[in-house]
Amino acid sequence: MEKNITVIKGDGIGPEIVNEAIKILDVIADKYNHKFNYTQILMGGASIDEYGVPLTDEALEIAKKGDSVLLGAIGGDTTTSPWYKLEPNLRPEAGLLKIRKELGLFANLRPAVFYDELKEACPLKEELITGGFDMMIMRELTGGLYFGKRTTKKENGQLVAYDSMSYSETEIRRIAKRAFDIAMKRNKKVTSVDKANVIDTSRLWRKVVSEVAKDYPEVTLEHMLVDNCAMQLVKDPKQFDVILTENMFGDILSDEASMVTGSIGMLSSASLREDKFGMYEPSHGSAPDIAGKNIANPIATILSAAMMLRYSFDLDREANVIEEAIEKVLKQGYRTSDIMSDGKTLVGTKEMGDLIVANM
């Protein structure tokens, strides 16, 4: 198989962690007779420094022509970086919003996987997490409150702010279908999260998701109110397989789930459109304070590369090899500084990548 991958190393620790992911992909290519062609583009602060904008039209066109995008991290220190003295539409994160919109990425997948080997890092009681857990949060990315009309105006002598939230049947149906498709590859359970006892968009959400579920009789569907889901994530995380929800709820719940796992340095993510194209990136930020020190955890980025193999290229076997190698390294006791605990062996970014290669 030959695939063209657009690489955006980005800012901060981005270049270091992406280099380790490419190292892993190259091993996969050699082992299974694939060919991955990499084309690098700039985005975020790196693009601002070079071109004065967070994403050039030329870079965007390159990304559109590829089969997928592998991204490191975008942004810098918001209190000290000159990038954040620019207008909002010229700041690093504006490039990320633009590329998501222009590439039509509407579905955000964020796995929250807890490894039994990292239980010391988890804030939950041991009896809640023994044996680990593995859930996938599917968040709608282009609709809802974040993309609705908004205004602030003066009424009766005081400021009043308005935000509007809307979802169409089409928007809900396409994200629901993607969630059920992914559940079919996993444990065949979807938990659809809404606020249908109060909000009209949630009532429509529940109706459309229930209709889509009829096409997937093998998958168990349950509906859960968002406040209950927030509680259940810390009370019994092992009950979840695929959590399907709208934009704002997904934003909040995915951050909560990441904290439950113990380290955001372990969490990958994918943003997909209706075909096989996707953009893959770690859930964490650019960590400018540790950039260039060879101490960043590359595992989230390497797991993002594994997601790319699975969801964009249909290479499930190859993705499994990467994920199993990471588990082996953790069982052997190797840790980067963010997941370090007593009695374990501290390694750097490059060393962690090499250890994963050695276990493949």
Q: Language model features by range: what are they?
A:
Residues 1-4, 34, 64-66, 104-106, ...:
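Short coil/turn connectors at secondary-structure junctions
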Residues 6-23, 28-29, 155-227, 239:
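Glycine-rich phosphate/diphosphate-binding loop of Rossmann-like nucleotide-binding domains
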Residues 11-14, 67, 138, 179, ...:
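Buried hydrophobic positions in well-ordered alpha/beta secondary-structure cores of metabolic enzymes
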Residues 26, 30-34, 65-68, 101-108, ...:
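Generic secondary-structure signature for well-ordered alpha-helical cores
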Residues 33-57, 231-233:
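N-terminal beta-loop-helix "entrance" segment that forms/cooperates
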Residues 45-48, 90, 233-334:
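Glycine-rich phosphate/nucleotide-binding loop
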Residues 49-162, 248:
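N-terminal glycine-rich phosphate/adenylate-binding segment common to multiple enzyme folds
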Residues 141-143, 147-186, 190-191, 196-198, ...:
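Glycine-rich phosphate/pyrophosphate-binding loop and the adjoining helix
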